[in-house]
């Protein structure tokens, strides 16, 4: 289900920081519980893709919400706690490396987005999705916004929740798989990570065998 509202943001005139204008436009049209949806982890060689959906309370929006990539780790963690305390609803979903390999990263990301919107404790009346694509079978109408985390505070909040959640998951994985430095690069294709892969090979269930440079070099024998 998709929907386009009248006053889409100007993608060539990004605000200095995300704001609540998209949400206010939708509320004027009768959509009150608006979920911002974002993902983290499309590109890494290891770990899950994580998505989050956040419905903010318009009267209690945390100060300083921004694209998670523009915030320090400390500030992300602070805002993570503030969002969980003040938001009307927060939902998180993830899909593992093996599921990504069996499908593809785009399909896995959209499915995780669908799951997190569906999993909100308060049903969303509308969803603002970061990116170009709208997941199939959402329980509400939706609009995809390119660079949405730079337009919408709801999407920015979702990006922070997803980023902090995934980083923590990868740091935990780093305590188990100590040879890969996961707590530092959280699965991305850094030089240190690629060197570790050359030396130790990938971990079944952790690494994405369908991604270069693993594809064609290694085989998931449990698939």
From Swiss-Prot:
Signal peptide: none annotated. Gene3D superfamilies: Ribonuclease H-like superfamily/Ribonuclease H. Manganese or magnesium. Binds 1 divalent metal ion per monomer in the absence of substrate. May bind a second metal ion after substrate binding. InterPro entries: RNase_HII (IPR022898), RNase_HII/HIII (IPR001352), RNase_HII/HIII_dom (IPR024567), RNaseH-like_sf (IPR012337), RNaseH_sf (IPR036397). GO terms for biological process: DNA replication, removal of RNA primer; mismatch repair. It catalyses: Endonucleolytic cleavage to 5'-phosphomonoester. It is found in: Cytoplasm. GO terms for molecular function: manganese ion binding; RNA binding; RNA-DNA hybrid ribonuclease activity. One of its GO terms (cellular component) is ribonuclease H2 complex. Keywords: Cytoplasm, Endonuclease, Hydrolase, Manganese, Metal-binding, Nuclease. Its cofactor is Mn(2+); Mg(2+). A divalent metal cation binds at residues 38-39, 130. Residues 32-223 form the RNase H type-2 domain. It comes from the Bacteria. Its EC number is 3.1.26.4. HAMAP family: RNase_HII_B. PANTHER family: RIBONUCLEASE H2 SUBUNIT A, RIBONUCLEASE HII. Belongs to the RNase HII family. Endonuclease that specifically degrades the RNA of RNA-DNA hybrids. This is Ribonuclease HII. The lineage of its organism: Bacteria, Pseudomonadati, Pseudomonadota, Alphaproteobacteria, Hyphomicrobiales.
């Amino acid at each position: 289900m998709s929907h386009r509202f009248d006053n889409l943001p100007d993608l060539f005139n990004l605000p200095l920081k995300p704001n609540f204008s998209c949400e206010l436009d939708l509320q004027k049209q009768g959509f009150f519980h608006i979920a911002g949806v974002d993902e983290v982890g499309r590109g890494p060689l290891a770990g899950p893709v994580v998505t989050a959906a956040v419905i903010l309370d318009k009267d209690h929006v945390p100060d300083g919400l921004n694209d998670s990539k523009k915030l320090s780790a400390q500030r992300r963690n602070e805002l993570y706690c503030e969002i969980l305390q003040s938001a009307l609803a927060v939902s998180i979903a993830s899909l593992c490396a093996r599921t990504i390999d069996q499908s593809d990263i785009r399909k896995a990301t959209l499915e995780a987005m669908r799951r997190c919107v569906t999993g909100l404790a308060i049903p969303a009346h509308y969803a603002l999705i970061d990116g170009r694509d709208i997941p199939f079978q959402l329980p509400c109408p939706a609009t995809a916004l390119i660079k949405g985390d730079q337009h919408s505070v709801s999407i920015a909040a979702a990006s922070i929740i997803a980023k902090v959640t995934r980083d923590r998951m990868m740091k935990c994985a780093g305590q188990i798989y100590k040879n890969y430095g996961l707590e530092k690069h959280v699965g991305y294709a850094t030089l240190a990570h690629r060197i570790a892969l050359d030396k130790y090979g990938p971990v079944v269930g952790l690494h994405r065998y369908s991604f270069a440079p693993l594809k064609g070099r290694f085989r998931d024998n449990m698939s």
